[in-house]
Amino acid sequence: NTEFAELKIRDKIFKLPILKASIGQDVIDISKVYSEADCFTYDPGFMSTASCRSTITYIDGDQGILRHRGYDIKDLAEKSDFLEVAYLLIYGELPNNKQYNDFTKKVAHHALVNERLHYLFQTFCSSSHPMAIMLAAVGSLSAFYPDLLNFFKEADYELTAIRMIAKIPTIAAMSYKYSIGQPFVYPDNSLDFTENFLHMMFATPCEKYKVNPVIKNALNKIFILHADHEQNASTSTVRIAGSSGANPFACVSTGIASLWGPAHGGANEAVINMLKEIGSVENIPKYIAKAKDKNDNFRLMGFGHRVYKNYDPRAAVLKETCKEVLKELGQLDNNPLLQIAIELEAIALKDEYFIERKLYPNVDFYSGIIYKAMGIPPQMFTVLFATARTVGWMAQWKEMHEDPEQKISRPR
């Protein structure tokens, strides 16, 4: 039996259906408010608005819960690899051995990009930001793969998702190599997804890169933790672009552009800069006071989240992962950024100012320290975020095209 909410406008009462969620909050259907009541709803930033039906990711920000297709993010980070999670997001279930092997082979098969794409990279200045290069390169893929400009059946959606998941890491590594003046390194299909990415990032034609298993496992976890996160800014951008029928390469390029914003994907670089500014553990109280001062421009980066009003479950995984990486590299006891971060977190979590405002460490707080220890420069942080989030973008894009209720997005 359908329940209704009542909306009174002037002297007339309108009944709005209450849609039952499979988990989480119920939703009031306002889709007919304009046609029946001649009014629009106003919700800046979509703070209370659900834009679609989705079964991919669930977040309970009050409890600090993140699940993909019903699986807890901590379990996935500890027990799965990135392509298993990619399969889960796209198809709705974890793969069996045959499905996993077939999927990984398809991804490896499509990792190579058209050789002519190399010429596009040469048009950029050597000082160009890798995100700028990546944005242009991904958008240009529609010129190299015109067979996916028109898609009509499920097989097209699957091929598109696989191609995108396969080629984005190659383009990400190429963007880095070009920015530092090194030759491109081709994908190696004998390596798994994460190993191959590290190989393309750090190998050179004259020197092979030996993948440290601790580094590989850490990057695998980072990719899993960044794979999808409901209808965030970049995912919503991909869905809105996709609602017009735009080709998937164009859609993902819009997601990359949105992710590049400092309030979205650039926060972990800001955390590193903040920790450097603080400089030492002794300076933390001074900067805590600055963060509380509304007249001071200093902001405590890596704390707080639009959705989470509890400890971000991804941050908890990354805190331990950070310690594992630094221990492997012999930096656990002498890394100044980690020492500042741990002490800053400890002080903030006991401070009433932060407790009252529910400001807890988020996923960006420790990820930058891990990247830096791996030898990944700050300008590449958001590129790696995009590499992981491509999986979520494609799962959401595929779900949108398979949803009969979806229309072209047109806010008023």
UniProtKB/Swiss-Prot annotation:
PANTHER family, per the entry: CITRATE SYNTHASE
Keywords attached to this entry: Transferase, Tricarboxylic acid cycle
An example Gene Ontology molecular-function term: citrate (Si)-synthase activity
Naturally occurring in which organism (per UniProt): Rickettsia bellii
Listed EC numbers: 2.3.3.16
Top enzyme category: transferase
Stated name of the protein: Citrate synthase
Pathway of action: Carbohydrate metabolism; tricarboxylic acid cycle; isocitrate from oxaloacetate: step 1/2
A UniProt-annotated Pfam family: Citrate_synt
Note: Citrate synthase is found in nearly all cells capable of oxidative metabolism.
Gene3D superfamilies: 2.20.28.60, Citrate Synthase, domain 1, Cytochrome P450-Terp, domain 2
NCBIfam families attached to this UniProt entry: cit_synth_I, PRK05614.1
PROSITE patterns: CITRATE_SYNTHASE
Family: Belongs to the citrate synthase family.
Active site (record annotation): H305, D364
GO cellular component, one term: cytoplasm
Disulfide bonds: none
Catalyzed chemical reaction(s): oxaloacetate + acetyl-CoA + H2O = citrate + CoA + H(+)
GO biological process terms on file: tricarboxylic acid cycle
